[in-house]
């Protein structure tokens, strides 16, 4: 799922940059537990909020997505009309619609709010799927927009960021303290960054779990919008058109990994299909 990968990558980068800038400026988290928690919340939520605000721009730039302003082909006109019709059913402002060139069957939705969003599809998706299946994929992405998944993800990421920063500083303070009560600032900064990365990885498991639950919900939303058979057909098509991607890129695809994993942004295709059949 592109929006999750881009959000997490941007969030981590911003979090690291903020910490470095604050350290260079001499703004630290020394003080009582209350001030440390407040400092951690500012750092944690700033990163996730900036990631959210930049998500649409970063998504466009990263894949070279071309927004359809005026349809040039019948296919582009159909895409716009389909997204517009689905947005009306959700009572949403029509998202921007974009196409990007990639042989990989893929699609994603992103944006800072329910009424300022982007839905993009790859040329590979359009080439490999029928109109009914593409309609189901669009409905899945529209469900993410309608459910406000990006904003909810921002809040969750902000909370876990806060505890990542808070706990890493607590541990760094204990390790960097000398016998005479003084503290090595270099050791403090290094230890806090190491534990921030470690705790950040553990915190990502929480975000990934949340992402998998939202995928089930988006599948259900798509089924409600266009019917479960179309969504099941789209997922089965993804199973029949595997794409050889580096392991670190699996989270970028609409299907995610084919197996269940703690680090997967998506449930397995088989589990998603089974869940849809049980509706």
Swiss-Prot record:
GO molecular-function terms, A-Z: metalloendopeptidase activity; zinc ion binding
Enzyme class: hydrolase
GO BP annotation list: proteolysis
Listed EC numbers: 3.4.24.-
Cofactor entry: Zn(2+)
Membrane topology of the entry: Multi-pass membrane protein
Alphabetized PANTHER family for the sequence: PROTEASE HTPX
Annotated protein name in UniProt: Protease HtpX homolog
Source species taxonomy: Bacteria, Pseudomonadati, Pseudomonadota, Betaproteobacteria, Neisseriales
């Amino acid at each position: 799922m592109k929006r999750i990968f881009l959000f997490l990558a941007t969030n981590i980068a911003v979090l690291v940059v903020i910490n470095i800038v604050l350290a260079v400026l001499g703004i630290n988290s020394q003080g009582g537990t209350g001030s440390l928690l407040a400092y951690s919340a500012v750092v944690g939520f700033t990163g996730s909020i900036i990631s959210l605000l930049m998500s649409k721009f970063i998504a466009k730039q990263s894949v070279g997505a071309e927004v359809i302003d005026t349809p040039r082909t019948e296919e582009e006109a159909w895409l716009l009309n389909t997204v517009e019709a689905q947005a009306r059913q959700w009572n949403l402002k029509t998202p921007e619609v974009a196409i990007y060139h990639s042989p990989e069957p893929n699609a994603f939705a992103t944006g800072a709010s329910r009424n300022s969003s982007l839905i993009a599809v790859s040329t590979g998706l359009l080439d490999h799927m029928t109109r009914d299946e593409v309609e189901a994929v669009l409905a899945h992405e529209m469900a993410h927009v309608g459910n406000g998944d990006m904003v909810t993800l921002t809040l969750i990421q902000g909370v876990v960021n806060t505890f990542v920063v808070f706990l890493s500083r607590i541990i760094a303070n204990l390790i960097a303290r000398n016998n005479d009560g003084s503290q090595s600032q270099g050791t403090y900064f290094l230890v806090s960054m190491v534990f921030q990365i470690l705790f950040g990885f553990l915190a990502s498991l929480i975000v990934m779990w949340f992402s998998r639950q939202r995928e089930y919900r988006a599948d259900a939303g798509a089924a409600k919008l266009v019917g479960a058979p179309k969504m099941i057909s789209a997922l089965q098509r993804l199973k029949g058109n595997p794409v050889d991607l580096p392991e670190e890129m699996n989270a970028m695809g609409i299907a995610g990994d084919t197996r269940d994993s703690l680090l997967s942004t998506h449930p397995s295709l088989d589990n998603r299909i089974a869940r849809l059949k049980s509706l």
